Amino acid sequence: MVLLEFSMSPFDKGASVSEYVARSLDIIDKSGLPYQLTAMGTIVEGEWDEVMALVTACFKSMSRDCERISTSMKIDFRAGKRGRLKGKIQSVESKLGRTLST
C-alpha cells in the first residue's frame, strides 16, 4: 500500500488558485480512496497504480486550462499494510497518551 502526499497548483493563474485545487479535490473525493486534505496538500492511501492514476487525472483536469503546473509528491510504500492514513497518527497518539490536533 502507498501513502501519497501531493500538491498541485497552476503557476499561471495568479495568487488565488483554490478553484483549481477544488477541481482536483472533487476528483480525489469521487475516487473512493481514503484521503486527508491538509492546508498544504492532500494525502491519499491506495495501491500504487490507483494513486498514480489519481495524480494523472488531477493533472489532466488542470492542464485543460493551465499552461504551467507545479506538482510536489512524497510517496511512502509499505507492503501489505492497510489503514496507515489513520493508523500512523493513532500510533503516535497512543505513545503520547493523548489525542493530537490533526
Regions found by a protein language model. Name each.
Residues 1-102:
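Charge-rich, low-complexity N-terminal segments
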